[in-house]
Amino acid sequence: MLQAMNTGHEGSITTLHSTSPEDAINRLETMMLMNDMELPVNAIRNYVEKAIDIVIQIDRLGDGKRKITSISEVVGMKNDKIALKEIFAFKEKGLSDQGNVRGEFVVYKYIPKLYDRMKRKGIILEDIFGE
């Protein structure tokens, strides 16, 4: 999967189970370490960092419904670890009278590296990020 993502062609997607965007990245690193390829950890991290742009976390909330709870961007390496920057998050605000989780989506004051690339592809983002 990571080999395919690193070929230079845009548009890969995959899923895995984890507890957070950071854990998802750690799990990818661990899966590569479990492979028979004998690569040093820093090479594996570099490989993962180049392959992944965005991590979208979906959680099952207290009412049993699934919701996107975090969108984070891979922003490079920091202290020999893959660094993530959260772009959006869902913040729970309690339960409605019907027992549904209430909350709001928070947009952080961070313009992702992918912003210009998405704009060139015709995705209108000004309503979210401003100009």
What is each residue range found by the language model?
Residues 1-79:
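Conserved P-loop NTPase nucleotide-binding/switch module
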Residues 64-131:
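NTP-binding/hydrolysis catalytic cores, primarily Walker-type P-loop NTPases
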